[in-house]
Amino acid sequence: MQQKENLVEEMGVHFERLFNLPPLAARIYILLLLSDRSGLSFDEVRDFMDASKSSISANINLLLQGERINFLTKPGDRKLYFKPSPRFLNIRLEESLGLLKKETEIVNQIMTFNTENNINGFEEVQTKLEKYAEHLQEVQEKYIKSLDYFHENN
C-alpha cells in the first residue's frame, strides 16, 4: 500500500503540471489509473485520499467533465464506480498535439515577422528557428500516427 501511496503522490505532482489539474484531482486520476479496472467506489476514493466528501466530489466531477474518467454501476449495487476513461491516452495525445501546433504557429509568426521587418541580428537565430520548426513538424507527425493507432484500436 505504501508503494501505491508513493506513486500516487509522485505521479500526482507530475499530472498537476502536465494536465493543469488541482492536486486532489491529479491524485484521484492517478489512483484510478493504478487500480483495478472494475473501478473504485466514491468511498474507496475518499478513504484512500483522506479528504472531505465535498472535495472528492468536486474533483471527481472535474475529471468526469474533462472526460479523463468514467463511471459505471454494478448490478444490484447503487454505488457509482469510477475508472479511467478508455480514451485517456487519446486525450493526452490530442492535448499535446494542440500545444505543438500552437508552438509551430508561434515560431512561424516570429520568423515571418523578423524576416519582413529586417530585425537586426535575426540571421543568427534564423537557422535554429527553422530547424526547431522542422523538429516540431516531425514530432506532430509522430503524434498523429500514434493517435491514428489509438483511434483504430480503441
Locations of regions flagged by a protein language model:
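Short helix-capping/hinge SLiMs at alpha-helix to coil transitions
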Residues: 33-38
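C-terminal regulatory/oligomerization modules of transcriptional regulators
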Residues: 115-154
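A short acidic, leucine-rich amphipathic alpha-helix
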Residues: 44-47
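Short coil turns linking two alpha-helices in DNA-binding domains
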Residues: 52-53
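Short, cationic-aromatic polyanion-contact patches
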Residues: 19-24, 41, 74-94
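Glycine-centered, phosphate/nucleic-acid-interacting loop/turn motifs that mediate DNA/RNA or nucleotide
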Residues: 67
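Short alpha-helical segments that sit at the start of domains
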Residues: 1-27, 153
